[in-house]
């Protein structure tokens, strides 16, 4: 009952239903567009290697330019940036589809359109997480709901990575990959525009005495670069898991290894969702950095457990148990970003988190792909993923480390001691 009351409290925050529902609809493209783009380009060229280049250009362009969009949003507000990118991104995808009708000769244009599409992907995650920080600020009267709100955001966001590929598969089944790409463009346009025109984004106002980013922006904020190391460790592990689990399934499946891999990854996601919902109703720890370090250490240990699982059933049980640490860790990650980054740099800070997560995930997947090709590679790849998270845990665990000091400073600013 208490748990339900807390989540109902989040739902009743003005503008919250819009963020929760249309925020997920607008971000379905994160799970749809890369796969649909890969399939479209492969159909044109007949080669997955060329299609993968288009996907890489799309991802790198988005990772490189999203912090710029975040900085602009911090200065003028998120609504104008979201509206502009909500239109520009679908137009770039349509341009890519038109170019794909011209065959191999249009490959440079396809690559260009992929880059533009990636660069213009709406910074919706950053805007939404920044909005939750504003809605549950220390002076809002809802500060006690911040942990629950960010846990709900983190847990619901995982739907994107489950539902997105399923929607692409459905479009391909009834039509083709081009229809899937159009579908991704439509949900991005509708969801982002709706959020941008909602009362939360339109009601954005600059915070008094806020510090706008200059130069390296939040990268110069004490504690934030160290937090990005933790983000990178998680990204490497998640990217690696996307390669390791299918490789494990291929080694152990008696039937279709692709279906088995999908089930195992889905089970991992279910474990994360359960953990996230449970964590959202817990009282926030007085020392979030220490709690973050403990969760990262626990997650790192689960990869060592995965490495010794003898069969898919055992791995599935381990995944659902180990997955329970993921959403809580990501919730604390988002909470610490909101605490450490100045309000005038919040959107940019969250876009840096997304950028580092995407880049490190790609790196983790690439390294894991090399490792699993060797004898006993699946086991070593799991250990590699766990080691990446362990590095982040070590950084967060430093008692007088940069993250801990930054959190202490933020807590003192939120709750000043009367003189």
Tell me what each language-model feature is.
Residues 87-104, 298-310:
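C-terminal ends and interior cores of transmembrane alpha-helices
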Residues 289-333:
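C-terminal transmembrane helical hairpin of 12-TM major facilitator-type secondary transporters
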Residues 113-157:
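Cytoplasmic helix-loop-helix junction between adjacent transmembrane helices
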Residues 344-375:
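A late C-terminal transmembrane helix in Major Facilitator Superfamily
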Residues 64-78, 172, 274-288, 372-373:
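Helix-to-loop junctions at the C-terminal end of transmembrane segments
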Residues 122-138, 245, 328-341:
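Intracellular juxtamembrane helix-capping segments at the cytosolic ends
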Residues 106-107, 172-186, 255-259, 370-389:
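A membrane-interface helix-boundary motif in multi-pass transporters
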Residues 2-63, 214-265:
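Helix-loop boundary and gating motifs at the non-cytosolic
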């Amino acid at each position: 009952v208490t748990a339900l009351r807390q989540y109902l409290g989040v739902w009743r925050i003005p503008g919250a239903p819009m963020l929760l529902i249309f925020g997920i609809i607008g971000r379905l493209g994160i799970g749809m567009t890369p796969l649909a783009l890969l399939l479209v380009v492969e159909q044109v060229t007949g080669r997955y290697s060329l299609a993968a280049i288009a996907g890489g250009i799309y991802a790198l362009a988005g990772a490189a330019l999203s912090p710029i969009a975040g900085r602009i949003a911090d200065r003028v507000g998120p609504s104008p940036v979201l509206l502009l990118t909500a239109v520009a991104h679908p137009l770039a995808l349509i341009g890519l589809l038109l170019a794909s009708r011209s065959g191999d000769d249009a490959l440079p244009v396809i690559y260009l359109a992929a880059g533009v599409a990636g660069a213009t992907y709406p910074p919706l995650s950053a805007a939404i997480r920044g909005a939750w920080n504003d809605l549950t600020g220390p002076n809002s009267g809802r500060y006690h709901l911040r942990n629950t709100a960010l846990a709900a955001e983190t847990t619901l966001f995982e739907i994107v990575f489950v539902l997105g590929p399923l929607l692409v598969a459905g479009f391909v089944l009834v039509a083709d990959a081009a229809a899937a790409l159009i579908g991704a463009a439509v949900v991005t346009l509708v969801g982002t525009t709706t959020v941008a025109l909602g009362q939360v984004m339109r009601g954005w106002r600059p915070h008094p005495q806020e510090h706008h980013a200059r130069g390296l922006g939040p990268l110069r904020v004490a504690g934030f670069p160290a937090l990005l190391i933790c983000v990178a460790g998680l990204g490497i592990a998640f990217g690696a898991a996307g390669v390791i689990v299918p490789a494990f399934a291929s080694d152990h499946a008696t039937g279709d290894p692709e279906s088995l891999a999908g089930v195992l990854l889905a089970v991992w996601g279910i474990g994360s969702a359960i953990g996230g919902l449970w964590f959202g109703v817990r009282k926030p720890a007085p020392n979030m950095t220490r709690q973050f370090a403990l969760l990262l250490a626990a997650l790192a240990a689960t990869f060592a457990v995965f490495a010794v699982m003898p069969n898919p059933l055992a791995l599935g049980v381990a995944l659902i148990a180990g997955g329970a640490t993921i959403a809580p860790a990501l919730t604390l990650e988002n909470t610490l970003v909101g605490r450490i980054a100045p309000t005038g740099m919040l959107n940019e800070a969250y876009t840096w988190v997304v950028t580092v997560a995407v880049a490190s995930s790609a790196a983790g997947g690439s390294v894991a792909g090399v490792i699993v090709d060797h004898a006993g590679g699946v086991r070593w790849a799991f250990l590699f993923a766990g080691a990446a998270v362990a590095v982040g845990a070590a950084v967060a665990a430093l008692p007088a480390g940069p993250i801990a000091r930054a959190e202490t400073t933020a807590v003192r600013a939120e709750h000043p001691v009367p003189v």
